[in-house]
Amino acid sequence: MNFTIPAPFTAIHTIFDVAFTTGLDSMLETIQEAVSAPLIACVTLWIIVQGILVIRGEVDTRSGITRVITVTIVVALIVGQANYQDYVVSIFEKTVPIFVQQFSVTGLPLQTVPAQLDTIFAVTQAVFQKIASEIGPMNDQDILAFQGAQWVLYGTLWSAFGVYDAVGILTKVLLAIGPLILVGYIFDRTRDIAAKWIGQLITYGLLLLLLNLVATIVILTEATALTLMLGVITFAGTTAAKIIGLYELDMFFLTGDALIVALPAIAGNIGGSYWSGATQSASSLYRRFAQVERG
């Protein structure tokens, strides 16, 4: 049996990965080139003004030096393509995935998820086509039931794949706009935007960890049980019994799919709680200082 695309999940993952990697890398270079000259000019002027204020005693020396160092580091990350690649992009695209892989329960690399889904898709399609050949062209009830079972299975596979593929793509998108967001870290009014950007990257890192723990177990379990379940379905007595068996297979996949689809919300709650807690702590600290000053 020949499919139009023998490995659809791997093919789609590769196509989108190459497209986004190429396009976003080009956009990142464009952004860095656009903000480099004006940012360096503004920061140079700001450092001169900051030095004058420190000399005149209008700004605390320690505070002024700390601000200058912070701004210098941020600017170096923004305008230096090598610095941004080494200290920001490589952390979230290389270091974090390698670190996450160490916590694998099944030993199944997370990168093989598309290939595993391709195998499941190919095996199930062989059985689906065999059962479809047994249904008469005038048996509308069985045809409708069969198509429903087929679409449910497609939906479970594609939704699980979508969660997996979206993590990598959206991480690339956030990293591509990183230089623009980091500019906001220099200013007090826009510093929260940069903090939320970092928080979102941490959320995707947590999601990658959860996928490595949960998705690999779910997919490996489904692949292991699939052969047995399809064998039982194939040798069922009647076509109607086989279609019922397909729905039972759908229920099995839906259970695993629910676990995978829930992971983004869990990662978002953990990451959001962390940053909400950090903001609350900073506000509480500010109120305490205000009370001390009034006292």
From Swiss-Prot:
Transmembrane segments: 35-55, 68-88, 167-187, 201-221, 226-246, 251-271
UniProt membrane topology term: Multi-pass membrane protein
A GO CC term assigned to this protein in UniProt: membrane
Keywords assigned by UniProt, alphabetized: Crown gall tumor, Membrane, Plasmid, Transmembrane, Transmembrane helix
Record InterPro entries: Conjugal_tfr_TrbL/VirB6
Keyword Secreted attributed: no
Localization (cell): Membrane
Domain of life from the UniProt record: Bacteria
GO biological process, one term: protein secretion by the type IV secretion system
Family: Belongs to the TrbL/VirB6 family.
Its biological purpose: VirB proteins are suggested to act at the bacterial surface and there play an important role in directing T-DNA transfer to plant cells.
Protein name: Protein VirB6
Lineage: Bacteria, Pseudomonadati, Pseudomonadota, Alphaproteobacteria, Hyphomicrobiales
